[in-house]
A protein has these predicted regions:
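The short coil/loop that forms the "turn" connecting the two helices of the helix-turn-helix
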Residues: 55, 107-108
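Long cytosolic C-terminal regulatory regions of eukaryotic multi-pass membrane proteins
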Residues: 131-134
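Key DNA-contact positions within bacterial/archaeal DNA-binding proteins
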Residues: 58, 110-111
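Membrane-proximal linker segments that couple transmembrane helices to downstream signaling/catalytic modules
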Residues: 2-100, 116-119, 126
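Conserved short loop/turn motifs at secondary-structure junctions
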Residues: 103
Length: 134
């Protein structure tokens, strides 16, 4: 009976080990994205992230999926959207168009910005910005 018990414990241990490694990698991804605001570079790919962290894109994807339920692009876009919202709220960026703010936040085009923003906030960036005006 003892052998059966051990057989059951090993996979659980492996899963726990895997999830700890996955959590660690996720934290490294977060740090890498936020340090120097790498998400502002529209060309910064999961592959580049993998190279920096000395891993591969499969592990990057798995770590993000395990910790957020989403994928690399969703995660990067969340940072970009948060950044864009902050810029729209700040008088420092009042001279920029909504499109320019989207590009500065790291979106590759106006369309990409509007689509991601509308999908998450259910409002266009322009309408959001107008709603901020006193």
């Amino acid at each position: 009976a003892m052998n059966e018990k051990n057989d059951k414990e090993i996979p659980a241990y492996r899963t726990r080990l895997k999830s700890e490694r996955s959590d660690r990698l996720y934290v490294q991804i977060l740090e890498e994205l936020t340090r120097n605001k790498r998400y502002r570079d529209p060309a910064f790919t999961a592959r580049q992230m993998a190279e920096i962290l000395h891993t591969n894109t499969r592990y990057i994807s798995a770590a993000i999926a395990n910790c957020t339920g989403g994928n690399y692009n969703m995660m990067v876009n969340k940072f970009r959207l948060r950044d864009a919202c902050r810029m729209m709220q700040s008088p420092r960026y009042a001279h920029l168009t909504t499109e320019e703010i989207g590009l500065l936040a790291g979106f590759s085009s106006r369309q990409a910005f509007y689509l991601a923003f509308s999908r998450v906030y259910d409002i266009t960036p322009r309408a959001y910005r107008l709603g901020l005006k006193p």
